[in-house]
Amino acid sequence: MIYALNVNSATERVERYWEMCVGSCHAATALREDYRRQLTRCARELGFRYVRFHGIFDDDMSVMKKSPYLGTYKLSFSNIDNIFDFLLEIGMKPFVELSFLPSCLKSGEQTIFHYKGVTTPPNDPEAWVWLIKSFLSHLIERYGRSEVRRWYFEVWNEPNLGGEGGLKNGGFWSGTMADYYELYAMTARAIKEADEAFRVGGPATSNNAYICEMREYCEKNDVPLDFISTHHYPTDVVLGYGVENSRNFFKEFSELDKTDKAAVNALANEFVTFRKNIWKDVNRGVLTEMAKCARKEAGNLPLFYTEWSSLAGLPSDGSFGASFIAKTIPDNMGLADAYSYWTFSDILEEDGFPSAAFHGGYGLLTLQNVAKAPYRAFQLLHRLGEERYQKKFAWETLDIYAFRDRSNNTVQLLCVNHQSLLHDVSV
C-alpha cells in the first residue's frame, strides 16, 4: 500500500457541522454544577456551540401548573432562565427541544424515563399554544429578538417511537404521527406569530423516518418548516422503526402480564440475545448511507441530525467508539448541516445514574468528568484545518483524510482504521 498526496490539489472548505450542537440529559440536570463544569469543558475543548436536551417543560422544571381551585394556569420560567443564562455566559446557545408536557396538560398516564416525562398529546391544545406563546414572549423580553433569532426550536422528540411504533404504553409519544403533525402545526404557527424569523423544525424522528411525510404535510397545510431534524444510530437498520421484529417485541412486551416474572424474563433474555448479535447485520459506514437518503428526502431544507452515536454499549467507550466518530464525521461532510452527538456526558438519568465510570454510556465524559476515547476523537477533529483535500484514500478498513491548515501552512492526515463490530478488521 502506497499513499501519495499532491499538496497543491483541490481542496474544499470544512464546515464544522459536527460542532454545531451536542446533546445532553434532560433540562433539569443543566441546573447541576457538575453538568455545567463538564459542558463548559466541552465547549472550550471541542468547540460545541449549541446544546439540546429533552424535558424543558417537565414538572421538575416547575414551568406550568394548574390551580385545583380556580382552574387557571400559572407559569414560571425561572429555571429555564437559569439554564439559558448559563449557556450564554459560556458562549453557547440553546437548541430548544419543545418537550415534554407539564402534567397539568396530560391526556393520559403515559410517561418516559426515570424522570417521567409526559408523552401524551395535550388535553387542552389552546393551553399548550398559550404556553408556547408565553414562552416566546418571555424569551424576547429577556434575551432580545436578535439573540433568539439565532436559536432553533424543535418540536418534540422521536414521535414515531410510541403509539405509532407499536409501544402503546411507552416511547416518546403516545399518539399517532397524525397527532404529532397537529401538535407541530399549532406549535410552529405560535412560534412564527412571535417572530417570523424564529426557526422551527421537526419531525425529530428516530431512524431518518417521516422526512418526506413531514415536508408533504407542511407544504399541503401551509405550516412553517425551516429545517428537517431526525436521528440515526447504526443499529437502526435492524432495530429501528418499521422493522417487524422490533415492532412485534414492543407489542408483545406492552401486552405481557408483568406479574408473570418467568414470561418477562424469557422475553427480556430473548431481546438481549437479539441485541448481542445485532452488529452482524450492521455494515461499516451505515450512517453515511442513511444520511445520503435523508439528504435527498430533505430537499433544499437544512438537515439536522439532532441525535447520533455508535450506540454499541461498552465498546463505545473505547477505541471502537473513537474510530466510529473519526470515520463517520469526515464521511458525512456535505450531507448534514448539523450533527449533534448524543451525549456530551454520562450525567444522564434516563434510567437512573450509572454506578460504574466506564459502562458503555452515551457520554463523551464519564460521570466523574474523565474523558473517554470518543472525547479524544472529537478533540482531534477540532484541531483539523479549515480546508479538506477532495482526494480520499481508502484501502480495506483503512481510510485516510487529508486536511490543510493555512494558519501555519501544514497538511494534516487523519488515518482511521475502523470496522463494524463482529466484523474482521484489516491490520
Each language-model region and where it sits:
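Catalytic-core region of carbohydrate-active enzymes that cleave or remodel glycosidic bonds
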Residues: V223, F227, A263-F353, A357-G360, ...
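Conserved residues at the C-terminal ends of beta-strands
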Residues: S24, H54, W156, H231, ...
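Mature N-terminal, pre-catalytic/accessory segment of carbohydrate-active enzymes
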Residues: M1-R49, H54
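Short, solvent-exposed loop/turn elements at domain surfaces
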Residues: A28-R32, M61-S62, V238, L422-H423
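Alpha-helical scaffolding within the catalytic cores
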Residues: M1-S9, E33-L39, L75-N82, L139-R142, ...
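Generic beta-strand/beta-sheet core signal
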Residues: H54, P203, T230-H231, T306, ...
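Substrate-binding cleft and catalytic face of glycoside hydrolase catalytic domains
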Residues: L46-W279, G299
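Carbohydrate-binding surface patches
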Residues: T397-V427
